[in-house]
Amino acid sequence: MRGRASYFSSNKSQVLKSLLNKFLLFFFFASPVFAEGSSAALQEKFQDWSLFKTNRGDQIVCYLASTPIKTTGSILNRGESFFLVTNIKNDADEISVASGFIYKNNSDVELSFGSKKFYLFPYRILAWANEKSADIDIIKEMQKNADMVVTSVSSSGKIASDTYSLIGFTQSYKQLKKICK
């Protein structure tokens, strides 16, 4: 894990851009909102969070992205983990998380802020809140806390836990709301 942590600290911007482009590629096939040639441009970094922006036709799509500061669990061939807050043309914000593997069917992905917990709905490699009100509540918690922990189960039944720093989140979220009108 130590090698991975030092890799992220030195190359975090490049890693996040690569992850976002993979995310956009995934959604190119899964959603009509995203068009061919998706490429998000880094707008600003706010400590542990990065703000990206792209245009899809007449829609502005912005993302806040971060990678874990700590990972646990021994899952073979685990890919990169990341957490996103997506905003499309200043519409409702949506959170999503990828833990670097295919999630177990009929499992929940737990997002915790100390004793406060939320449960996300996983589909293949991504997980989302079940409703917009949960997205809103999660974003409020992200603004009040120093970190959050994502606990999930892989398709092989192994448990993984990723800790994300929330340092810089509030500032990056305010900027997202400002530039994504």
Task: Describe these PLM feature segments.
Residues 35-181:
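A generic "folded-domain core" signal
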